[in-house]
Every structure is written in C-alpha cells, then in structure tokens.
C-alpha cells in the first residue's frame, strides 16, 4: 500500500484518542500498510509503537505536535517528524526548551533530521488575503526544511474540496507539497470520544 497514515493520535494523549499502538499496528498490517505514523504532544507512545511495528515488520514514523510561530495572530498547527537519529536528538533539544510556540530561530538551530508538516486545517487557509499575508512565513519555513516541508490537508466533503481550490493554487504556484493528512483518533466508529 503506497498511502501512509501519519497523523494518528494514540491513547497516550489522554482524552484525545482511543487508539492503542498495538491494535493500530495490527489493523494496519491486516490492511497491507508497510509504513505507519503516530503524532502527539509527548513521546510516551514511541516505545510501544516502535515495538508493535517491529513485530509486524512495519516501518514506524514518529511525529511531534507543535505550535509554530506566525507573523499573524493565529499560530500554525504543525508537526515535526523524525527522519534520523540526529532528528530525534534535535527534537529532544526542541522539547527541552519548553516553548509553547516554536519559532524560526529555534528551528534553524535544530531542524536537521526533521520534517515539518503545517496542518492547513483552518478556514483561513482558503482565503486569498490570509494566504498572501502568510506567504513570507511559509517561505522561510520552506527554505529551512526544503524537500522536508509540506502542508497537511484533510478533505472530508465535496465542499471542503471546492473551498480548498485557492489553497491548492497557492501551493502549486510556489511548489509546496500537499499531503493527505486526516487526523485519526479511533480505529472503529464505536470507539470515538465525544
């Protein structure tokens, strides 16, 4: 299977998800996944997820949820994904700084071995004024991460698809990658948190 689910929260994010790493990996194996990712605002799920993936011969991808600084009033919701041992070390250094909002200067120092995905999940991303305003910020993050930079987008309806046309054009003109990035918080509908 060529699609990789990256934005899956686990039950280690109390009140955010019901997904247990072992069950998630087992189900992914049944569906033919070869690579699988998790995200969170802590690292607690990493060991059990790594063990479950190793047992099922699935490549594990680890992401960390951050709030990314913006020159606008609304910061960006984003994720740093570990690509290498150096990336893991750099992520630990970023976490050690205990910043609520991560800025460009900190990322300049510790971006090696990491990928950045900005989640384009706010209606503002579909408005021309906002896209023009954030263009400078986005250019700086893209220059820093280069091919390891992307936008994550979730389209849940035909209306979402129509609304996102302007955003797609914005990304196409600037050659920004867009990834399917739906949030997964449960494996079965009956497990959904209210």
List the predicted regions and their residue ranges:
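Phosphodiester-processing cores and adjacent nucleic acid-binding clamps
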Residues: 1-194
